[in-house]
Amino acid sequence: MTTPSPPTNSKSARHKTRQPELEADYNRSTALGYEPTNEVGFIRCLEHGYPTPLARWHCHEEYELHMITATSGKAFIGDWIGPFEPGHVVLCGPKLPHNWISLDIPPEGVEHRDLVIQFQHGPIDQACQTIPEFAELLPLLERARHGIEFFGLSESSQSHWHHVKESKGSRRLAAFLESLKLLVRFAKQHR
């Protein structure tokens, strides 16, 4: 049985979906919580509250490890929609649209809600060519293209975020790799 198509002038035919905004370096201001680009390599930390111009349906070229520390609401990650609350940890792959919308915010907003680490694929891929140990990251990063939610990692993920944020140079890279190693172990145990 088929259903007749609505006339082309109907409201449903005119309904348009909103495409995610592609975020780029030019609109990543330190005023929004980003680290200055001259102070970071391929690993960037970000902390922000809610509401903020950063909370919107968007995507970007980098992977994003996203941790929620306050409020609850609805998460939109790729084609998945579900609840979030403090402790929500997700790894989003490049160009995977995402947004977290808080539903329980006080009138004055929340100063700290999100802890984020963004990183590029290229440097990791290049490192895999000469440093075989990096290859253990690739299955995790492949799965992240559709988003991976991690349960029970909030405290350790936040601790790793602060360690990465406070570190510079090779210590920052080592702290970042420790953070990814935690995710790799967890993902292997919870397939």
Question: Model-found features: residue ranges?
Answer:
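Conserved long hydrophobic alpha-helices within structured protein cores
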Residues: 84-100, 176-179
